[in-house]
A protein has these predicted regions:
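A general marker of short, structured functional hotspots
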Residues: 29-32, 70, 116, 120
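Short, amphipathic alpha-helical "lid/cap" segments that border enzyme active or binding sites
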Residues: 64-68, 72, 177
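Catalytic-site neighborhoods of secreted/periplasmic enzymes
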Residues: 1-67, 78, 97-98, 105, ...
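Active-site-proximal cap/lid insertion segments
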Residues: 40-59, 74-81, 86-200
Length: 200
């Protein structure tokens, strides 16, 4: 798959893809990336197993923090060379695996569902979860949503997301919000901020 990283690397940029590649479950390093840190499929929320430049490495901590740490390391190691960092966080995705056949399952030894970093867990515990008027209603006249998926109940009240899950999902991006702040702070400390384009 040709990506914009190939011409950038050819032009002398150090390039890094760090995060959730998720074009299938194959996390093999792709052409054009000087640094490759990816996970198979969805990856794990806690202590993720990563493909770091072709080697399996077990990381420690919440995946958002782990990926941000790799990004900071890459920026620091770039020294005076031009660089391009593509950071793709796993959050807001729930903690589950998607098999090659499309079926899903839980990750052994991992918490299920939406997993915020411990420091953010419970931040919205007392928040009221707003609901649309059609929440939990079967999707009448929407054939694509009425299709049967093996192993899953039809959409409706049985598949409605609980308030607890909504709150946890809202807590997950708090770590993602911190990530660019940490990167911008490092760029400023290294004197690179004014010469760096940041796109979110």
């Amino acid at each position: 798959l040709p990506t914009f990283a190939i011409p950038l690397e050819a032009a002398g940029y150090r390039t890094a893809y760090i995060g959730k590649w998720h074009m299938g479950n194959d996390d093999t390093r792709r052409p054009g990336w000087t640094r490759w840190v990816a996970m198979k499929g969805q990856g794990e929320a806690i202590d993720p197993m990563l493909n770091v430049d072709g080697e399996r490495q077990q990381a420690t901590g919440h995946v958002t923090d782990v990926l941000t740490d790799y990004a900071l390391e890459f920026v620091t190691e770039s020294g005076g060379k031009p660089f391009m960092l593509f950071l793709a966080h796993k959050a807001l995705h729930p903690n589950f695996i998607q098999r090659d056949d499309g079926s899903t399952g839980t990750v052994a030894g991992q918490p299920e569902g939406f997993v915020p970093a411990d420091r953010h867990r419970g931040r919205y515990a007392s928040a009221t979860v707003p609901r649309r008027p059609n929440a939990g209603v079967a999707p009448v006249r929407k054939p694509a949503l009425q299709r049967e998926i093996p192993g899953l109940p039809p959409l409706g009240t049985a598949t409605e997301t609980s308030d607890t899950d909504v709150r946890a999902r809202l807590e997950m991006p708090l770590g993602v919000d911190e990530s660019p702040g940490r990167i911008l702070q490092l760029l400023e400390e290294l004197g690179k901020l004014e010469n760096t384009v940041v796109t979110l």
